[in-house]
């Protein structure tokens, strides 16, 4: 399958990634992506940016080198109540927010605690995507989370990077994907790139989705406008004309 969108990418601003914003945009353009999300880690990630970075996205272009640019954040869930490490004032300015659990920002809890964190964060209207919930370091009740995502219109990410960097993720990601298929929940495939050469490349995630027969209509990033319409319907991207 051809993917035209990657909403989960990092720049050197994240502290442990290796390419700049412009290098990422150039690579996205080179490989034919139509939409690129820059979603650097929130400030509680060691080495991550401060809030001024996220509050200053107004200086950034909306389009560059033929690519529509989404300016967002992979925000860290910092407690089991679903609190994020960026305030509402910042959240409402962003085009896209991925909410993720990272063990350097919150201790892994029980299945019940981890599930509660994801359920609670989906009550936040600014959250668009749940990041890498197939991470076995944070065991969850996958079916409860997937059903809640459908109720709250939150996208479930299938994270290609998890297949490599988070040991044991392959089976949990497949379980999540099968539940999304069962309950007809929209998914988005993300590279979680930390260097530009990973952008728009989802081979392991794509192979798994083909294996389980994921319906293409449930995959948000196989068309340019699906993600843009999704975000506009949530009241975002007011400056972007889709006509």
Curated annotation (Swiss-Prot):
UniProt: Zn(2+) 1 binding residues: 8, 10, 74, 192
Coiled coil ranges: none
How and how many cofactors are bound, per the record note? Binds 3 Zn(2+) ions per subunit.
Q: Which InterPro entries does the entry mention?
A: Phosphatase_YcdX_put, PHP_dom, PHP_phosphatase, Pol/His_phosphatase_N, Pol/histidinol_Pase-like
Indicate whether RNA-binding appears among the record's keywords.
Answer: no
Which residues are Zn(2+) 2-binding? Answer: 16, 41, 194
Q: What Pfam families does the database record attribute to this sequence?
A: PHP (PF02811)
Q: Which GO terms describe its molecular function?
A: phosphatase activity; zinc ion binding
Keywords attached to this entry: Hydrolase, Metal-binding, Zinc
The record's section on CDD domains has: PHP_HisPPase_Ycdx_like
EC number, as in UniProt: 3.1.3.-
Record: residues binding Zn(2+) 3: 74, 102, 132
Q: What class of enzyme is it?
A: hydrolase
| Required cofactor names | Zn(2+)
Protein family: Belongs to the PHP family.
> Could you tell me what this protein is called?
Probable phosphatase CLD_1129
């Amino acid at each position: 399958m051809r993917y035209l969108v990657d909403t989960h990418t990092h720049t050197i601003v994240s502290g442990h990634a290796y390419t700049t914003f412009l290098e990422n945009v150039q690579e996205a353009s080179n490989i034919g992506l139509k939409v690129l999300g820059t979603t650097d880690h929130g400030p509680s990630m060691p080495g991550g940016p401060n809030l001024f970075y996220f509050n200053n996205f107004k200086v950034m272009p909306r389009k560059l080198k033929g690519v529509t640019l989404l300016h967002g954040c992979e925000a860290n869930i910092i407690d089991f109540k679903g609190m994020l490490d960026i305030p509402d004032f910042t959240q409402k300015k962003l085009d896209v927010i991925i909410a993720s659990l990272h063990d350097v920002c919150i201790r892994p809890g029980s299945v019940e605690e981890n599930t509660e964190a994801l359920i609670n964060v989906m009550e936040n209207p600014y959250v668009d995507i749940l990041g890498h919930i197939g991470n076995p370091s944070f065991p969850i009740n996958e079916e409860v989370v997937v059903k809640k995502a459908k109720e709250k219109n939150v996208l479930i990410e299938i994270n290609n990077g998890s297949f490599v960097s988070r040991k044991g993720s392959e089976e949990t990601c497949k379980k999540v994907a099968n539940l999304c298929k069962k309950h007809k929940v929209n998914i988005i495939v993300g590279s979680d790139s930390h260097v530009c050469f990973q952008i728009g490349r989802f081979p392991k995630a794509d192979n798994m989705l083909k294996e389980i027969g994921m319906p293409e209509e449930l995959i948000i990033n196989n068309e340019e406008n699906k993600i843009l319409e999704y975000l506009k319907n949530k009241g975002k991207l007011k400056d972007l004309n889709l006509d």
